[in-house]
Amino acid sequence: MNPHHYGLILAGGRGTRFWPRSRKRSAKQVLDVAGERSLIQATVARLAPVIPPQRMWILTNEYLRRTIIRQLPEVPQNQVLAEPVPRNTAPAIGLAAHILRSLDPDAVMGVFPSDHVVRKPAVYRTVLRAALKAAAAGNLLVVGIQPRWPETGYGYIEFPRGTKPGAAQALPVRRFHEKPELANAKRYLAAGNFYWNSGMFFWRADVLLDQLRRHLPRTASVLASLPRFGSRRFAGALKQAFPLCENISIDYAVIEKAAHVSGIAAGDFGWNDVGSWNAVYELLPHDACGNVTAPSSICLDAHNNFVDARGKLVALLGVRDLIVVDTPDALLVAARDEAQRVGEIVKALEKRERHDLL
């Protein structure tokens, strides 16, 4: 393992599309929605053969920090940082780069979502090693994943024409595209050189900080003013300074403005961003009628349903394509094809000031 390679796992999201199980203090990334381990535990385990937990850093919030520390005893506690206020991904990544640059001038960092699933980890780690190697040479690097269908829920990375998946070398990125309409998604799929944006980034810490100084100077100045990580003044200074950072994603702040961005056009490593309960349904094994539910459930003339109701017997009769998620204080019943809208329920609860259900 290269001692200059570090991992930053972003774990501050609320996962509102996974209500009612996902709450402020038990968000999607710390839930076991797609297996026996939580999503963040699976992420750390997947990275560990390339980046050991001792060199992993986690950015989260005050609500989740203790839970993450409890779930990941292998990660040093002082490397699980809580943002004082949410400021999107650019300040969070900039903060980690600032700390890593101060600890290791040659630090190369990979930035990873905490809540994705990878079904082919060996293939994934091959991509990871290639990305870290390319980033060490000074590249800003993204990972694109070969699309398997015309997805409208992902952004796309446009590579040069003729790009083939699975190559280990870094390629120039021609352009980034926002989440498309279906017609454009079909065109991207047919073209063959448009890849899903995985949300994974790789760069030297000093290269990223230089880009922040160019494109986000206020945030760069705020971060540069912080005392050395580990000093007595660091926590208090961070609490005062971090709210002064711009609220902006790393994509808009740096990646889409940088003069040169490279990418790896990855093949299929079984990636899924697990963006909704329906995505969980697609991931888990089904019974003969297409249902995902506990073995004790009773399903009569019921097809293609997803049920998460732990500790209760569930009986389904004459229904299809439903999502049912039960918790002690809330019950969700939704059509599977409306799963992306579950976050609207959270907004409705916020308007009603039902903080007990958030």
Residue ranges and their predicted role:
Residues 1-4, 205-358:
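Left-handed beta-helix
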Residues 1-9, 16-27, 32-123, 129, ...:
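Conserved N-terminal catalytic core of the sugar/cofactor nucleotidyltransferase
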Residues 3-6, 53-54, 76-77, 104-107, ...:
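Short coil/turn connectors at secondary-structure junctions
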Residues 35, 45, 49-52, 73, ...:
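Generic secondary-structure signature for well-ordered alpha-helical cores
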Residues 40, 96, 115, 157, ...:
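Residue-level signal for inorganic ion chemistry
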Residues 86-91, 149-151, 182-184, 271:
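A short acidic, often aromatic-flanked loop/helix-cap motif at beta-alpha or helix-coil junctions
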Residues 109, 174, 193, 200-201, ...:
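A residue-level structural signature of the nucleotidyltransferase/glycosyltransferase Rossmann-like core
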Residues 120-242, 262, 336:
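Conserved core of the sugar-phosphate nucleotidyltransferase
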